[in-house]
Amino acid sequence: MSLQGGCFCGAVRYEAHGQPFNSTLCHCTDCRKASGAPAFAWFSVKTVSLHWTASAPQRFRSSEHALRSFCPSCGTTLTWHDDRWPDEIDLATASLDDPEQLPPADHTFVRSRLNWVNCDDGLPQYQTTRSSG
């Protein structure tokens, strides 16, 4: 599978090859703050499968082991990478040219969900991560 996407202004573009995994709608406070949204859709790919095809994004360390990236021109959130899992990187689902092809498979960090966000879509819900339950 080949996935293409990029930022709002088009300055940063990427292509990812291979099978995406861990498609989720994250409700954690960090993702909400970084995106300015009530929840944020991510999917994972193998780090080696991600290639920047235009300008590269700006990166910043958002926590002890997390590195986020965004477009330095328009501010679009693009990636999240955890040092504890160096072989995978999360991409912002809505940054895909066709985000409809990767709907969320679950909700993560619902313990941090805003009370007015409705999660009655039948998808599995995890208090924190999938592995933590």
Language-model segments: which ranges?
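A short Gly-Trp-Pro
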Residues: 1-133
